[in-house]
Amino acid sequence: MISAMLALLMSVTAVSGMSVSGVRAQTNEEKAREIVADMTLEEKIGQKLMLSFRSGWTMRDGTSVSAVTTINDEIYDIIGTYDIGSVILFAANFDPDATVNVELTDGLQRAAMDESLGKNAIPLMLGADQEGGIVYRLTGGTALPGNMALGASGDTDNAVMAGEIIGSELSAVGVNANFAPDADVNNNANNPVIGLRSFSSDPQIAAEFTSAYIAGVQKQNVATTAKHFPGHGNVSTDSHTGLPSIDSTKEELYETELVPFQAAIDAGTDMIMTAHIQFPNIVTEQLYSSLQDEWMSPPATMSREILTDLLRGEMGFDGVIVTDSMTMDGVANYFDVNERNLLAVKAGVDILDIPFNDMSSWADMESKLIPLIDAFVQAYTEEDGYQGITLSQDELDESVVRILTMKFNRGIMDLAEDERTLEEKKAVAEEVVGSVVNRESERLLSANAVTVVKNENDLLPLKLDEHSRVLFASTYSRNNNRFVLAWERAKQAGLIPEGADYKILQHYNWTGLPDQVNSAINSDGTNFYGTNQDLLDWCTVLVHASEISSASNIDGYRVTCPQLFINYCEGLGKDTVAISLNQPYDVQAFSEADAIVAVYGTTSAGLDITESFGGGTISANAAFSPNLTAGVEVILGTFGASGKLPVDIPRYISGTGTYSDEIVYPLGHGLSYDSLVPDPDKQALQTAIEQAEALDLSEFTEASVTAAKEALAAMNEALADAQNTMLTHKLAQSVVDESTNTLNERMDALMELLVYDTDKSALSAAIDDAMALQEEDYTENTWAAFAQALADAKAVLEANVDQEQVDAALQALKDAQAALTLRGSEAPEDPQPSEGGENKPDDTETGAATGMGLLAAAFLASAAGVLCLNRRRRTH
C-alpha cells in the first residue's frame, strides 16, 4: 500500500513539477527571468549579438594570424567585457585536428564565464552551419550526403541518423548550436542558393525530414535552427548577393513554404532563422532605405508582420528567432550597419547573426562593436531613439529570457559546472569526430540516396569480368580519388575480377575527341598520355559524371562534354553510364546513355585515401563529400539501388537558362536492384574481438608485459583493424576471415609471452598434502577420481594460467580428497534383490564414484585445454 502511494505521489510530482518535499522546481524560463532581472542594459544587449572571427586577427602589436583557430587575449577580453552571447564558427575556425577545436571553444567559454570581466558570466551559444552535404564546417568531421540526398532515401530514419552524427560531432568539439536544418521547399529548380540543401520540392516530404533531422540533432543536446523563414526555396536570386522577392500570397505560403516550418515548430526546434527576402503581397510595412534613398518593402528579417505577427502570433513559435548574416547584400545594400540591426530587433529578432563584417582586430571592436552597442542603448533609452528607431525594454527582457531559456534547455548554462579537464574533452573529440562508425554510417546514408533514373537492359549493376576496362570521367580532379575509393571498396567486396582495369579522365574545360587529354591517370597512379579518343577506344564501359549548379550549366561543357563522349561510345556499342553529381536536373541531358544515376552532391574538398580501404578509408583529418563514391559503389553493385527523386525534373529549354513546366522525370521516380554482395558471417570476428578486448594486463607480471611490448602493439593494431572491419559494410567473406585470423594469430603470439601473476601457494600446499596419501587405503573408484584431480592440479601448477584456473584446480583437488572412501568402510551388500530389478552391489559407492568421475572428467577436459587456454585470455 505504501509503495503504491509513493508511486502515485511521484507521478503527481512529475506532472505538477513538485519535488517530493513539496517545493516546486524552477522551470528553465523562471531561472532565465531571475537572471535577466539582475542584468544591466548592456549585458542584455550583449546576449543578442553573435560575433564571428573567420577573417584572421591582427593584434595591437601588429602580429597577425590568417585564421582564428585558437583564442587570443584580445578576443578573450572582448567576449568577456561586452557580455557577448553567441559566436558563430566557420570552416576557417576549425582545424582538421578536433582537439584544436576543443581548445578554441573551451577558451571562448572561459572568456564568457570569466567573472572578473562580468558579474553574470553567461556561457556562449557557439554555433555553426553544419547542415551536411555541400554546407559543413568541421573540416575533420563527417560531411554526410546532404538534405536532398536524405530526401531521396525516402526514409526519415536516415535524417535522424544524420542529425545524430552531426550533433555528436558538434557537441564533441564544444559547439552547442547547429544552424540547421534547411527547411526550405525547393520548388524552384533554378534556385541559385538552396538546391541540394533542401530535402524536397514536396512540402510534406520536406516537413517530415525537417522534423526527423531536428530530433536527431537534439538527441545530442545541440540546439537546432530551421531556416530560412518564411521560405527561400522559390527564388532566383541569392540573398548573399542581392535581395530576392517572392510574390506568393499568405495562403500560398501556408500551402507550401510554411509547411516544414510549422513541422519544425511542432517538433520543438530551438531557433528559426530569418530570410533576407521580400514578400510584397504579404507585408504592408514600408521601410526607408537610407542607402538607396527610397521606401521599400522590408525583407522578412526586418518585417514585424512576418516575425511577430505571422511566426509568433499565427504559427505559435515561442523559441529564439535568429537572423541570417546581417552582412549579406540582401540587407547590407539597403541599410547601414546600425540601422539594419536595430530594425531587425524591432521586427522581433532575438539574436543578430554577424551584425557587422567579421571582427579581425581590436580596432574593429572600437569602430564596429562599441558604436552598435551605443546605438542600441540610445534606441532603448532615448525618446527619439537612434535615428528615429526606438526599441522596447520590455521586449528586450522577453527576448533575453528566450535566449537564456534556450541555453538552459540545451545545458549551456551548466557549463560552469563541467568539471572535465581540457584533456578529457579532447579525448572525447578524438573518439567521436570523423570516427569510423560515423563514416560508415555516412557511407550507408549516401548509398541509400543514390537514384537510378534509367537502366536500359539492366546494365546496372555492372557485371565486370577479367576483360572489363572502365573509364571514369569528370570535370574536376577532386573526384579522382572518389572513383578510386569506390573501386577499391568493390574489390574488397569481391566484385572486381583479376584482370579488370580502370583509368580516370579529368577535363576541366571543353575538349574534343581528338584533343590531348586535359589530365588522365592509369590505375597504378601514373599519368596517361594520349587523346580523349584513345581513352574512349580503350574502355569497354564509360562512367561519366556531369555537374550543374544552375540551369544555364546544361548548355556548358560540364554537360556537353559528357554528352559528346557518351554518344561516341554508344556509337561503338560500348556501355555508358551518366552520373548527375550536383543538382539532379541534368539527368534529362543524357538520353543516349544506357544508365543514368543521380547522387545529389559534391564539394571542392579533396579526399585523402589511406592504404586501408575497409573501415579506415579516410585519413583521420579529412571530411569529404561521399556522394560520388556512393554512386559508383551502387553502379558497381557493392550496394543496391533504392533512391527516388525527391524533386520533379522539369524540361530544360535549350539556350535559355530556364526550365519549362513539362516534367521529364517526376518526383518519386527511381529504379531499384539488389546488391551483388552477400552479407559476410562476422561471428568469429566478433568473438575474436571480444577476447582481445577482455585482455586485462594487470593479471600478468610486469616483466612479461614489458617483454611483450611489441607483440602487444601488433595485437592492438590487428584489433583496431578488426573493429573497423566489423563496422564496415559490404565486405567479401575472405576479407573478414583474414581480419579474424590476423587478430587470433597476434593474440596467440602475445599470450605466449605474457605470464599470469598468480598465487599458487595454496595449490602447492594442497598437492604436497595429497602426495602423502596412500592408494591402498582407499577404494579403487574414489582413488581414481582423486588421482586424476591431483594430476590436473600438478599440470596447473606448472602451467601459465590465470588465478581463476588455479583456484578451480585447488577446489577440484580438495573435493576429490574429501570424497575419498577408506577401504572396508563401504556400505554392506543387500542380499535381497531390490524391487523391479537386480541388486547392485556397492550402489551407493558406485553412485558416488560416478559423481566424482564426472567431476574428474569435467576437470580433465578443462586441464587438457590448459596449454591452449593459457595462450588466450578468458572471456568474461
Question: Model-found features: residue ranges?
Answer:
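Preference for extracellular/luminal or secreted protein segments
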Residues: 25-77, 83, 313, 334-691, ...
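Second-shell residues forming the walls of enzyme active-site clefts
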Residues: 37-40, 63-66, 71-74, 96-120, ...
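C-terminal membrane-anchoring or membrane-association module
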Residues: 860-876
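Sec-dependent signal peptide cleavage junction
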Residues: 12-27, 840-851
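Short, hydrophobic alpha-helical membrane anchors of single-pass surface/secreted proteins
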Residues: 2, 846-858
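Short glycine-enriched loops at secondary-structure junctions
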Residues: 54-55, 126-135, 176-186, 226-232, ...
